[in-house]
């Protein structure tokens, strides 16, 4: 899991640092954000100290109604050595008791001009993306008609050459050779290129080429949600390959399953066209049109009625 700190939030969202500078590199370990409303009332029994604390106009309005002693007590309990940071929304002024407690415990206090709802949404999305579990898969990721297609297979089977052909046909390259995959939600896998390999494609006999330089900015993407896996393998005459498309294999990455198709490779087969059509057919299936199922139903009707013509 990647490491995220309050300093990353400062750089990403241009927050203002009000206090607790010595704690800006304290790790944030969860994407959950807490609004300490009940804690302002003095109830800290279930206080989630390891979360970012988001304070808005409601919390500060209640805090102003307390005595100075109560303010100091609540802010001292709010700022623990485990708290990764406190964020104030709407450009609100930080109470002096909060500043003092934060400096004492090294809790970064940040301020933003965004509303509380906007701030919560943006920070949560950022943390979910950065803290998502990550794995690397050997393959190529291409955006084909809006479908993120992960092309896998053994070394030398033709993954990069197929990707190059797809780029020439107007599709967009995301990553070649190594694809970093993050599970951002239970059913969402997003692929990224390693920074070192971004926009690069390796073609045996040709070397490394820069796809963006050769084909333009429209030929690449920085990331893409993965929906389909196309596995390339050398043609095995002893193996029975699916010819109807009724069966659907799955590939599991983390807790998410995606559709997987196996494409046998041998001379004369245009893999780019096959994968392109597979992506279009996958989109049709998601819209409710299944050619294989329709053919199967027609065949069943013919058999049942004893007809001899299709």
Swiss-Prot record:
Query: Do the record's keywords include Metal-binding?
Result: yes
Q: How does it assemble?
A: Homohexamer.
Look up and give the organism this protein is from: Shouchella clausii (strain KSM-K16)
Q: Which residues cross the membrane?
A: none
Residues binding Mg(2+) are 160, 202
EC number(s) stated in the UniProt entry for this protein: 2.7.11.-, 2.7.4.-
Q: What reactions does this protein catalyze?
A: [HPr protein]-L-serine + ATP = [HPr protein]-O-phospho-L-serine + ADP + H(+); [HPr protein]-O-phospho-L-serine + phosphate + H(+) = [HPr protein]-L-serine + diphosphate
Q: Where is this region: Important for the catalytic mechanism of dephosphorylation?
A: 264-269
Q: What is this protein called?
A: HPr kinase/phosphorylase
**Region (Important for the catalytic mechanism of both phosphorylation and dephosphorylation), start-end ranges:** 201-210
General remark: Both phosphorylation and phosphorolysis are carried out by the same active site and suggest a common mechanism for both reactions.
* Uppermost EC category: transferase
Keyword set includes Kinase: yes
Where, by residue number, is the active site? 138, 159, 177 (proton acceptor), 243
Q: Which GO terms describe its molecular function?
A: ATP binding; magnesium ion binding; phosphorelay sensor kinase activity; protein serine/threonine kinase activity; protein serine/threonine/tyrosine kinase activity
């Amino acid at each position: 899991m990647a490491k995220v700190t309050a300093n990353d939030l400062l750089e990403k969202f241009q927050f203002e640092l009000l206090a607790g500078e010595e704690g800006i590199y304290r790790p944030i370990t969860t994407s959950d954000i807490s609004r300490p409303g009940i804690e302002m009332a003095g109830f800290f029994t279930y206080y989630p100290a390891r979360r970012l604390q988001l304070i808005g106009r409601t919390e500060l309005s209640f805090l102003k109604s307390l005595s100075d002693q109560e303010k100091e007590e609540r802010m001292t309990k709010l700022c623990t050595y485990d708290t990764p940071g406190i964020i104030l929304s709407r450009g609100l002024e930080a109470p002096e008791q909060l500043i003092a407690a934060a400096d004492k415990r090294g809790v970064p206090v940040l301020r933003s001009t965004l509303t509380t709802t906007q701030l919560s949404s943006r920070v949560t999305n950022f943390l979910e993306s950065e803290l998502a579990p990550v794995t690397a898969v050997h393959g190529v990721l291409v955006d084909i008609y809006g479908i993120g297609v992960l092309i896998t297979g053994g070394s030398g089977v033709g993954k990069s050459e197929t990707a190059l052909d797809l780029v020439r046909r107007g599709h967009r390259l995301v990553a070649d050779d190594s694809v970093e995959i993050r599970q951002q939600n239970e059913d969402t896998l997003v692929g990224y290129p390693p920074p070192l390999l971004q926009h690069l494609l390796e073609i045996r006999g040709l070397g490394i080429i820069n796809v963006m330089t050769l084909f333009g900015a429209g030929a690449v993407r920085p990331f893409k949600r993965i929906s389909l896996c196309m596995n390339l393998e050398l043609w095995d005459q002893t193996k029975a390959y699916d010819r109807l498309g009724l069966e659907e294999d799955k590939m599991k990455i983390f807790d998410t399953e995606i559709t997987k198709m196996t494409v046998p490779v041998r001379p004369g087969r245009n893999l780019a066209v096959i994968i392109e059509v597979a992506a279009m057919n996958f989109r049709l299936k998601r819209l409710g049109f299944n050619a294989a199922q329709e053919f199967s139903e027609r065949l069943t009707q013919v058999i049942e009625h004893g007809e001899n013509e299709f």
